Every structure is written in C-alpha cells, then in structure tokens.
Amino acid sequence: MDLKQIAGEYAATFVKDGMKIGLGTGSTAYWTIQKLGQRVKEGLSIQAVPTSKETEALAQQLNIPLISLNDVQSLDLTIDGADEIDSNLQLIKGGGGALLREKIVASSSKELIIIIDESKVVTRLGTFPLPIEIIPFAWKQTESKIQSLGCQTTLRLKNNETFITDNNNMIIDCIFPNHIPTPSDLHKRLKMITGVVETGLFVNMTSKAIIGTKNGIQEL
C-alpha cells in the first residue's frame, strides 16, 4: 500500500460521529477523504468544510455533507497534508496552491492533524520552495520586495499560464539559500509586505503528525 494512503486512511479513524471537520487538499488528504466517504456511507454522521474547490468536488462525489465555515464557530478537527514538516511540527504547505483556505480552516479548528509520508520530514524547512500567495495587482513590485529578504523567486505557472488560486490570487515560490532557520520570524517579515496575502509557513498550528513509513504508522 502507498505510504500516503496508509497515513491518510489511518487519520480518518480520528474522526468521530457528530464532528465538524476540515478536509485538506492534496494527494495524501485524498485518501482520508476517500475513507471518510466510505464511513459516511456506513452511517458516520459528520459535516465538513473543504479547503479547496478540488476537495469540495471530491467530497460532493462521495456524498460527504458540506457546510460553510461562516455557519459554525469552530471545527473539531482538520486533517491535511504538508510539503515539509520539522521536529517542532512547523510546516511548509501550499504545493497544491490552496494554502490560504487551508490556513483559514486550520486556524478555525480545535485540532490540526497533518498526514505525510516519511519523505516530507526534514531537519530544517526550506528545501521545498515556500509558496507565498500574493494579489495580482502590481505583483512584480511585491515579488521584488520578497526577493529583498534574500530568496530566489519563481512565479508559479500551470500549463504555461500563470497559476491562479481559488481566491483569484497568484503564487510566488521562494527558495532561501540557507533554508529557513526561524520560520515564525520569516512569516512575520513576509506578512508585513504589502501585496502578500498569506505564506505557506504554518507555525504553532499542528497538534499531531501522522507519518506513513515503510515500517508502518509513526506519530509526532
């Protein structure tokens, strides 16, 4: 069985009857959503908030009841993937382009469970390019200010055209030569740049990480 599938399906066991949950986006969250669809068919009663249009479509296909985050005060649990995670449960997310909605949903949840395969565990964040969501207006000015923090930047494309997020924004992917020693500081500095909507750094948000390894499930 695929390591992502092992982690994703195991995470679904943390979802209990009556919960309001956040559904993540990406190739690992896919397996959690598939498993939850199966459990809903078997009688599990939940309500879910999707973190992307892609996840919304999948949940609807599986008949998972969906709600708006505007209609609830908080969520019991969100299960989502990550592009990198360190030993302090700090994350880089946004490889799939849904980082803003993922962060809004995660910050509205009592618990955030991150599901990954062992290749995503790192000693220091930053090998994976850090996604930053920016508004399209004067985007080159915003990119220039991001570069002034010492990174190399690339405007994200899809099918040779500018990638547009579900929020009609753009994404700049950033590589920092010395990785990211203090993610919380970098996040604050990036957020101070006018035009930056959100960063893919998730700091002090994760409750637990479920890692699919060749030897089975490991929890952080």
Swiss-Prot record:
- Which reactions are catalysed by this chain? aldehydo-D-ribose 5-phosphate = D-ribulose 5-phosphate
- Where do the TM regions start and end? none
One BP term from GO = pentose-phosphate shunt, non-oxidative branch
This protein's pathway reads: Carbohydrate degradation; pentose phosphate pathway; D-ribose 5-phosphate from D-ribulose 5-phosphate (non-oxidative stage): step 1/1
Q: Which species is listed as the source?
A: Bacillus cereus (strain ZK / E33L)
Top class in the EC scheme: isomerase
Its EC number is: 5.3.1.6
> Where is the organism placed in the taxonomic lineage, from the top?
Bacteria, Bacillati, Bacillota, Bacilli, Bacillales
Task: Provide the alphabetized UniProt keywords.
Answer: Isomerase
Q: How does it assemble?
A: Homodimer.
**So where does substrate get bound?**
T25, G26, S27, T28, D80, G81, A82, D83, K93, G94, G95, G96, K120
User: What is the name listed in the Swiss-Prot or TrEMBL entry for this protein?
Assistant: Ribose-5-phosphate isomerase A
Matching InterPro entries: NagB/RpiA_transferase-like (IPR037171), Ribose-5P_isomerase (IPR050262), Ribose5P_isomerase_typA_subgr (IPR020672), Ribose5P_isomerase_type_A (IPR004788)
PANTHER family given in the database record = RIBOSE-5-PHOSPHATE ISOMERASE 3, CHLOROPLASTIC-RELATED (PTHR43748:SF3)
Q: Example GO molecular function term? A: ribose-5-phosphate isomerase activity
